[in-house]
């Protein structure tokens, strides 16, 4: 078997080979390993014996590996194997030495099987087939037997050594021939597997030809049905195109409705702003009314002051009237005294003292009159001052009244502005109503178009029913094809 492998075994390739997964795939679980060990005759004693030979493996590993690779390099067919690996020969020798040392581990479980399976896969990737693999192992058989023979005959004499050498010489040819037979048997197995694979491929090809013949009629029916579906699809497409045109009209109407809605929204914004202005003006009117109310309150207070001043004038007038009465009494008494003085004067000659008394009385009355006159003068001055104060209060009243009038006028102007704003709001609402009417008309037109679209949708639905029936037929045909194809499995 020649080496036709062109795969380069790199570190990534080696790391990508999972020995455990490979062992699981070929069925090397614990039960299978136990059966193979038992069938081969490897029991606990055998394992113990192999473990006891570990010193021998360690002593001979390097020499055996060197002989192993020298043997491979001596044949042209196996020389190409080294070019398929990125490892050097020395690195390969180290790996092979580790393999030999593993023979004496004494435990041959799933871990051992996974490692050996991985090594076997790497050999396969390298292109090292069963013929080379089994043939090259005769170098290990020879080396290990020679090492065992040397170990056995040590210090046992020439006769024993000759007997062992004869045993080795007689057994090695048999072992080599058995290995050769194993190579041929392995090739036979491989050929058998390959032949069965070819037979299976031929069988599948024949079945595929039969399937192709069987599906020809259903496929023809499927083609005819598909053609019918295509025709109905054209019909549906025409209806769909018409529906698209109508939907374009609907879209335009919707655009018009959208424009109306935008106009309504814009008018609503204007109405909102007008309402806000009206509200602000109303607040100003309320503030103006409050100012007017405060002004009128001030007027009321000023009026109260005027009233109090007038009342004080009235009281002063009463006092003046009282003083005037006193003056009248004094005048009357003065007249009487004057009369008496005249009388007494006539008697002056006889009673001068009586005249003097009268004169004193007149003098006293004159002084009292003078005091009363002074008091009257003071009262008059006080009345004049209070009168001036009353006049000032009346001026303030007039001023407050003027301010009140101004506030009322401002309130009236504000109320007029509120009225105008309300009128603007009413006008805006009228515009909203008009736009809403236009929107209603557009909506009716859209509704009519939607009815037309609905009718076209009914036609499309009918066409879809026909397509559904054709599709069902296709499904049944596909089922027939599936049953026929199922024969391939």
From Swiss-Prot:
Biological process terms from the Gene Ontology for this record are: aerotaxis; chemotaxis; signal transduction
Ranges for domain Methyl-accepting transducer = 218-454
Q: Which CDD domains match?
A: globin_sensor (cd01068), MCP_signal (cd11386)
According to the UniProt record, one GO cellular component term is: membrane
Q: Does the keyword Metal-binding apply?
A: yes
Q: One GO MF term, please?
A: oxygen binding
Assigned keywords, A-Z: Heme, Iron, Metal-binding, Transducer
Q: Could you say which protein family the record assigns here?
A: Belongs to the methyl-accepting chemotaxis (MCP) protein family.
> What is this protein for, i.e. what is its function?
Heme-containing signal transducer responsible for aerotaxis, the migratory response toward or away from oxygen.
Record note on quaternary structure: Homotetramer.
Q: In its UniProt entry, what is this protein called?
A: Heme-based aerotactic transducer HemAT
Q: What organism does the UniProt record list as the source?
A: Halobacterium salinarum (strain ATCC 700922 / JCM 11081 / NRC-1)
Q: Which gene is annotated as encoding this protein in its UniProt record?
A: hemAT
